[in-house]
A protein has these predicted regions:
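Single conserved hydrophobic/aromatic residue that forms the stacking wall/gate
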Residues: 1-4, 8, 12
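Hydrophobic cores of alpha-helical transmembrane segments in multi-pass inner/ER membrane proteins
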Residues: 22-35, 120-134, 191-206, 256-277, ...
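Long hydrophobic segments that form regular secondary structure
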Residues: 243, 247-348
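Membrane-helix interface motif
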Residues: 5, 67-80, 89, 175, ...
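Mature extracytoplasmic enzyme cores
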Residues: 19-74, 107, 114, 121-125
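Carboxylate/His-rich catalytic cores and anion/metal-binding grooves
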Residues: 43-93, 128-164
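Membrane-interfacial loop-to-helix junctions in multi-pass inner-membrane proteins
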Residues: 37-59, 139-160, 208-224, 249-256, ...
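Interfacial helix-loop-helix junctions of multi-pass membrane proteins
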Residues: 168-190, 240-247
């Protein structure tokens, strides 16, 4: 109790996203805010389909909160305890309700707890916006470039927040975990880096589509993978299927997220395969040594890096499933394969 009393009010408040149920509640809040501003500031013709796609995604996450989690269960439990221990006035003599249970020891009394998780959540949830813009246009077989403008603008915000979140997370790991470095290629670190790489690739390739009418199909694929990678990242972080110092598993969220990831992936593939032919007449890149060629090389490197990191992250899971033995992929794998690609990228 003494430790809890000394916790700063900030850390008590930040316990909202320190728990599983609270973090999903925060996800729903961010998604609702993003949806409001998207529909308010992007006056898109026939936006009913955008609303339906948003609603479908929102129902999925709200569904977990409604049917499988109870973010206020602790408050209710403490209230009941308070009533039982009160004499004349309910809650006056409670010994827990004013203190709470406190966050995980790794999360206690650190200022970055107030910044790092929300930054990542805003970055993750924000990837829904370009996905909605691209999917609705593809579904309507709209061959105009309106969607790429919307998708590009709505990618900048989550990309920026992901950048801040990843940077702060690296600093936090260096200070708290004490492994002598800012980045250890931990699975949870990897799954936050993958959508950042894909979003960076899209922000480059979208400019090529606007200027030369190429890479239409590729941009749709990137936008879809950006969104799916955020669901995958949340699955890895919250399910505990992979060994990570950052993973906090609890309840049946892993199964629920895996189900959602499967459904969203199948819908993405189905809609794309049914309608992608309407976007297959884009022009071809002719000058590979010009701006377009370098942007394509940039995309190849970024996507390849994301793919290598994804394979290295999930390989232990498949290995354990097949051979019933746990393994980990060391940093040498990433340093050898990803390191040179990122160095080439810096040269571009």
């Amino acid at each position: 109790p003494t430790i809890l009393r000394r916790q700063r009010q900030m850390c008590i408040r930040d316990s909202l996203w320190g728990s599983l149920d609270g973090s999903i509640l925060l996800w729903n809040l961010c998604l609702s805010i993003f949806m409001f501003f998207y529909l308010k500031y992007y006056k898109i013709e026939n936006s009913n389909l955008d609303i339906k796609i948003f609603s479908f995604i929102t129902i999925f996450f709200v569904g977990y909160t409604v049917f499988s989690s109870s973010p206020f269960a602790g408050c209710i439990e403490l209230a009941i305890v308070g009533c039982n221990k009160s004499t004349l006035i309910p809650f006056q003599n409670t010994f827990m309700s004013d203190l709470g249970r406190g966050p995980n020891p790794l999360l206690q009394n650190h200022p970055l707890m107030a910044i790092h998780p929300p930054m990542l959540y805003i970055g993750y949830v924000g990837m829904t916006l370009p996905f909605v813009a691209a999917t609705s246009r593809l579904f309507k077989r709209d061959q105009s470039d309106d969607w790429i403008e919307v998708a590009e603008k709505t990618t900048y915000v989550p990309w920026l927040f992901l950048t801040i979140g990843i940077t702060l997370g690296a600093a936090w790991s260096y200070e708290v975990l004490g492994w002598g470095g800012y980045w250890a290629w931990d699975p949870v670190e990897n799954v936050s880096f993958i959508p950042w790489l894909l979003a960076t690739a899209f922000l480059h390739s979208s400019k090529i589509q606007k200027s030369s009418k190429t890479l239409l199909n590729w941009n749709y694929i990137l936008v879809g993978l950006m969104f799916l990678s955020t669901i995958f990242g949340t699955f890895v972080t919250r399910s505990g299927v992979l060994i990570s110092v950052h993973a906090f598993s609890n309840g049946n969220i892993g199964t629920y997220l895996l189900f959602g990831l499967t459904i969203f992936s199948l819908l993405f593939i189905f809609i794309g395969s049914k309608n992608i032919e309407y976007f297959s007449d884009s022009k071809k890149i002719t000058n590979w040594f010009g701006k377009s060629g370098f942007f394509v090389l940039n995309n190849i490197i970024l996507f390849s890096s994301a793919l290598v990191i994804f394979i290295g992250t999930i390989f232990p899971l498949f290995y354990e499933t097949i051979y019933d033995r746990q393994i980990t992929i060391g940093r040498a794998y990433y340093d050898i394969l990803v390191g040179p690609m990122l160095l080439v990228l810096l040269g571009l």
